[in-house]
């Protein structure tokens, strides 16, 4: 079986697909990952063949671009959809051409993220199966609202309808440029978004129970990750961990555009007297501004680091949310945009996180109260139970089996 995976997003979006590709290769299949050049390092480390898609995701997420403004305003759906569509629309024709070239001779194309619509178009052009994949559960259900809408916005009665609304709005934002790219390859215009295709999710059924009303072609396989190779921490990190009690981890991944000075001030005040590991990521926060109880760190494997922490303060991306839960430690979530509000609520419902802290108006008191709840025995015990269940999952292996069945059908 030969598959290619086409996705576009941050490094955190690409990393699970690198793990999935490695799992496919270990099962005797061919796999190749297509993504932004800056997000392919994890695939290369795993020996996964890669092809770069046009674009500059890190530059696009910088503080002077539209998506940063969306974050600053609080992640409204319409603004988010337009800002994200702008990224894909600028590259639609190039992406479609690259995916078609890489996909010649393949059995199926897995599509995700901002490359999904052109990915399905490439599968149509090549006459192969298009399979949706990802870490955000977008298959319609009455169990929960669309992950792209803050849960508190949607009355339960409208959960099912919210998915159709979001799909229609997303397609409206992507449609014209997607159809223009399709026309370059003599494909007819699409009037509506793709539906009815198989979906494979790198999502834990222990964190998000499988909805009873999902179709048979939607699969929750568990988190996609491969255990990090033997990893040695830098001396500064090793010494810090050995010098005292388990620290608090703070990191907001690829998020930019928020009021980082205000947020950092609130965190520094709330963390007074505590040991803290701080990962600046793409935030633009200067590590020189950190007090002595903070240690700034670089990229560190979450599966190595998080079990050594007392709690994880993060933005609520699917990958970080899963990794913290899998490590058996509580989370404190400060969501900014997109599906981050959804994962903040899933962690709260699972009993492993307090209510989310507002990142637009961060207050030290809010972080202090959340940290008291997160480090209390009840939440720590619940996190340990959930972590044990998630570590027993075989997310990559389950996804490989599901894909084998889908392609063979």
Language model regions located:
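Nucleotide-activated sugar donor-binding and catalytic core shared by glycosyltransferases
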Residues: 1-11, 16-32, 38-48, 80-83, ...
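Generic beta-sheet signal
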Residues: 34-36, 53-56, 112, 133-134, ...
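Short, polar loop motifs at secondary-structure junctions
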Residues: 34-40, 114-118, 204-207, 280-286
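Conserved nucleotide-sugar phosphate-binding/catalytic loop shared by glycosyltransferases and other
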Residues: 34-80, 155-158
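Short gly/pro/ser/thr-enriched loop/turn and capping motifs at secondary-structure boundaries
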Residues: 40-41, 57-61, 136-143, 147, ...
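Conserved nucleotide-sugar donor-binding subdomain of glycosyltransferases
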Residues: 66-118, 158-195
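Conserved nucleotide-sugar donor-interacting segment of glycosyltransferase catalytic cores
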Residues: 90-160, 206-207
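Donor-nucleotide binding loops and adjacent catalytic segments primarily
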Residues: 203-311
